[in-house]
Amino acid sequence: MNDRRILVALGSLALAVALGLTASGRAASSGQDRTSRGGGIFKISLNAASGIDYLDPALASTPPAWTLLDTTCARLLSYPDKAPPDGFRLQPEVAASVPVASNDGRTYTFTLRRGFRFSDGKPVRASAFARAINRVLAPAMHSPGVQFARDIVGAGQVVSGKTTAASGVVAHGNTLVVRLTRAAPDFPQRMASMFFCAVPPTLPLDAEGAGAFPAAGPYYVVDYKPAERVVIRRNPYYGGRRPHHVDGYDVDLRAASPQDVVKRVDRGDADWGYTLSGIYFDPTLGLVERYGVNRSQFYVKSGLTMRMIAFNLSRPLFRDNPGLRKAVNFALNRRALVAAGGSLVSRPTDQYLPSILPGFRNADVYPLDHAELKRARVLAEGNLRGAKAILYVNSSAIPMAIGNLVRQQLAEIGLDVVVTGIPIHSASAAYFAKLATPGEPWDLAFGLWSPSYIDPFAYINLLFDRRFLGASNFTRFASAPVNEQMRRAARLPQGSDRSSAYAALDVRLARDLAPAAAVDFLNEVTLVSGRVDLGCVALRPVLDLTAVCLK
């Protein structure tokens, strides 16, 4: 299988999570509580550097793409437009109820609600979701979502090109039955990801991605011209309960730069834009002084994208060398690394699970506000193995500044770090595919991780389970006892026992094995124009476009 589009965290934009996946804050009451808000066209500005890659749900892997798809997507299950803890509670959307697994945990049966229709008027049947799953598995698509469907019975035969439909996916009328090779309590959460939006049963395979096609969500894409525009309008046959106040969205993809995106919104030429969080804190823009934070039009909310320094365990320096990996963790001054991008951009962390996830346990494994050099030097002594390391970072200004800070900090424990700028965004699928390439000569890599659905599996297992070696497990961490502990946790049903098991894994991995050095979790930053009714601004933590309304 080609893993060039492995699922990754994307940009300093912790989107994945936001789109129907979680609610981390709300500027005001949700538009969902209001019956009607006057229509109008909501204007969006995007730039190529932080724009969309595809509008095909099987292929999309950037935050803005998922943000737009959230307006058009109808899923079996989704999450409410509410702040946590309610925002983490899975609820049915097209499905009539959240499914209960069979006694052996390997079969899920979804019964669809009546009333959902595509924008061409055709009814949504179970075949729409079967097609979505099989498109993700199709080798011609190279979908980053394939890792969420690997354990469906027959998935391997589709991925290998031997058949076009997984035998474990059976659609009949309004009933969808999915059989798995092993128990997977997180399977309903996976079905809430954007990869499994309802699509027309005849939607063809296209490695370049389908653009404008019938959708079953509140809106649908009328026109898409890459690098130019996207036109989205109301689905006249929408049969769901999601808010949909505006008449549609006009998306201009031609902003000259990330700064231009923000400037367009600030002066009212656009109502919202998506760009790197750090751009908003450029002092020349003066947004904090003009709007304040979380008061009027400008919002900073805790996000779910982790920035980390990954260790390459396939190379001699860090392979079978947990002492040096822990030494690096103690030598880092995380607060200083955060300050390189602006103090409001993120919050430092030393663990792999976000603190807003249910069950999180703060273990204070490593210092956040300073380096602990005495302890770091003791751990590094005798473990430096030549004391030279190659650090990959994106070649743009802020990542390079962070890379040089890391170089200076690790010099304190005797490690000579060469910072290598890579002209690929450090949150892009291409960057993570490069890290996963066998023989790629990196020892340390600065990157970002954001889940496609809310479950600790999406942080712990996807990053560190040996089943995902060469894909999302780009560190190549492989520990038999820890793998067994991860898989036991994955088999637990949703609830406090599962949360506690993953909290223990999080602490064990960070404290004892350190396959990566967690640095911080990015905040999500939102600026809206003066045309936007702030009573309809719902932050999940990215702006919920379906809920917006205009004054």
Predicted segments with their positions:
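Ligand-site clamp/hinge motif
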Residues: 205-207, 237-286, 416
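Surface-exposed binding/hinge segments that line
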Residues: 109-111, 128-130, 135-201
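Periplasmic-binding protein-like
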Residues: 314-357, 401-402, 508-518
